[in-house]
From Swiss-Prot:
Highest taxon listed in the record's lineage: Bacteria
Membrane-topology descriptor: Peripheral membrane protein
Protein name: Protein translocase subunit SecA
Positions of region (Disordered): 849-915
Native source organism of the sequence: Actinobacillus succinogenes (strain ATCC 55618 / DSM 22257 / CCUG 43843 / 130Z)
Catalytic activity: ATP + H2O + cellular proteinSide 1 = ADP + phosphate + cellular proteinSide 2
Cofactor field: Zn(2+)
Residue positions binding Zn(2+): C895, C897, C906, H907
Main location: membrane
Amino acid sequence: MLRTIATKIFGSRNERILRRLNKIVKKINALEPSFEALSDDELKAKTDEFRQRLANGETLEQLMPEAFATVREASRRILGMRHFDVQLVGGMVLTNRNIAEMRTGEGKTLTATLPCYLNALTGKGVHVVTVNDYLARRDAETNRPLFEFLGMSVAVNVPGLDPEVKRDAYKADITYATNSELGFDYLRDNLAHSAQERFQRPLHYALVDEVDSILIDEARTPLIISGPAADSSELYIAINKLIPSLVEQEKEDSDEFQGSGDYSLDLKNKQANLTERGLEKCENWLVEQGLMRPEDSLYSASNLGLFHHISAALRAHTLFQRDVDYVVKDGEIVIVDEHTGRTMAGRRWSDGLHQAIEAKEGVKIQGENQTVASITYQNFFRLYEKLAGMTGTADTEAFEFQQIYGLETVVIPTNRPMIRDDKTDIMFENEQYKFDAIIEDIKDCIARHQPVLVGTASIEKSELLSAALDKAGIAHNVLNAKFHAQEAEIIANAGYPGAVTIATNMAGRGTDIVLGGNWKAEVAKLESPTEEQIEAIKVAWQQRHDEVMQAGGLHIIGTERHESRRIDNQLRGRSGRQGDPGSSRFYLSLDDALMRIYLNEGKLNMMRKMFTTAGEAMESKLLAKVIASAQAKVEAHNFDGRKNLLQYDDVANDQRHAIYEQRNVLLDNDDISETIDAIREDVFNSVIDEYIPPQSLEEQWKIPELEERLRTDFTLDLPVRQWLEDDNQLHEDTLRERIIDAAKAEYQRKEELAGSESMRSFEKGIMLQTLDELWKEHLSAMDYLRQGIHLRGYAQKDPKQEYKKESFQMFTEMLDALKLSVIRTLSRVRVRTQEEIEEAERQYQAAMAAQQQARQAPLPNAPASSEPTQGSELSPEEKVARVAAERHIGRNEPCPCGSGKKYKYCHGSRAKDHA
């Protein structure tokens, strides 16, 4: 009550921010006449002037009015477009850590030039982030003439670039890039084996276009660089035969309910759970197939891999639908982005799910991967010193932007009043009645020459509706993942009088639908258009444009409500751009996913009773409340999921930050001998503590065991017992000192033999190689810990606290293992001549070059609710060659190729054969 009264008196926070910014707009407008009077050279010189003033201590905020006036005038001269006042407001909002909600058609691309120019003056680099390659290239080419006129360099960073080109792209003042490529380059930089291989500068300012898509929809998407793991395709094929025999039951077993099925589904969380009966059936089948021993259980440690395969196969068959979640294209499973309806070539689900779907569809099963490096978009974008974003739909997620990223959302008013007519939702009893009503609405629009855009939630639904329109004899275009290549042409024609376009979700987002069609697209089709041809096309377009305006603009039909209000608003936002007329209406049915999953049976039955005649339509305030309630539940559920993930990922993020920071220190230093000396002392102290416990009696010392350990692990043949017999004054501390001094002396002897420069390079290489290998294993261990940690809740323990505690312990153990492994390797390496160490270094550098070449192969483009991966791994032979070049491999050691066999039975035997 009091808040409402205060808002009426003082205005909302958004209104107060806009009032403050409008005062600065007046200053910019006042500068306009003087900037119009400047010559081109004088206008260009402003950039150097601003940079000098920054160096002299002025702030970006102080420079902002003049900088914005400079960009506005340059844009008028170079692009023929003058920034509206609301675009200046948007630019000011984006200059700092804020999100600007700007409606479709309000010129976000032009608005972005203002904060990009201002922040690029610092010389630290600006990243403009888009959701796909096409938009990155388009926006860069659109704004390049403006920025280059003002003395700013512009580059595009997309997958597949040559390393040197990519490196130059990051050196540009303003770099346009996709979100996935920025994330993968960050991970690649932290796998580099020399400082020169890195691409990125410190992350300064990112302006994220379609920020809701990237920071909300993609928030849980981990970017993963991975290498191949063991092949288990035969097992996926075998277990795929088991799943069809399992029977679904209504809900999970509990004290109150005992079903007769083999599994139950949790559609909200996309989980499938075996019942006790189902578990028993699976175990019997596995025993029959010879995949499990009769006395074993699926839950025993040795069979967890089998359980993992069954879980993946069950989810593949029951929760992932063809033409909804994925399509089969050229013998491969291609994921469909649930938010945009676009396919994402090269993206793969993790945890064996992708392989299980490949087995289900009978296509070639590709190998599983082991994570080498990963980061989520949530944590990657929080690395930027300054982060800002723009979208047409942010206000509904304002709380999450503030909570997770510390970004305030400011709603920017439209340049012209919005006159779109958003009609009340209509509900039908079932999908067939709903489709019938949609077809009647489309027929009415066609009769009045009004273009229609029909939004569907999946490829499957778009094809069902398309079939219904074909049956009704209505010509139309379909824009979904299957027809992705024709997207630009379909969108260009979607504004024609009477055109009917069906689009999955927000396919085509980022491209405006022009009323009357896109005349520029028509001109582009002509090889060498004459002035007369262009003029004729413009005249024809103007007639069509006027006809569509008269008919009411673009009409939007939503075939069902989405889980998020934001997605609904995005669909509506395609109409009514820049003050154009338009209309929208959502058609719903009780069969819709939102109703089935998020409304209880009681509410659904109550609503069914409200329909008294076949095909009856219902629209009421109650309906609006029910839908709002269901969407609020989904949004809250999804927010909790993202927040929960972040709490877990923050633990891994702290560790990642520590490892990558240490790695960069290693890369930037040619001499790490002091670090090696400190590690050696730590390692030997720890080893000695195992056999000579601190402050213990001499009778408790295990001297023979200590001598053996020093001999086997560090090739130190020290007569410790003889020392003790010969010197009565030798006590714990002096003995410890003598052992460490002996280790240092032996290492010094090797260094004199090999040469300091070669030894420094070798130390750095071994340190990086060992760190990467152990970090990779640590990531796998963290994944396993994360997957099972929720079970601690049954023991009345907080899973998050348990995860933090155990992951910290694992991290500490990894660092101890790193120290031991590095010192053990350096101690055991055989060094006889300068030539030998140089040959080992040459082989190591060759192996690293091969690994780097694999990492820089073209990456899959684009993000979704899956995990994008990139391969980077040496062959088994290269691994063995690299280790053999560094040291002698014992016959009974595990083979370095990773097979799990002893060296003498694996590559050791092959080496013998070749000898």
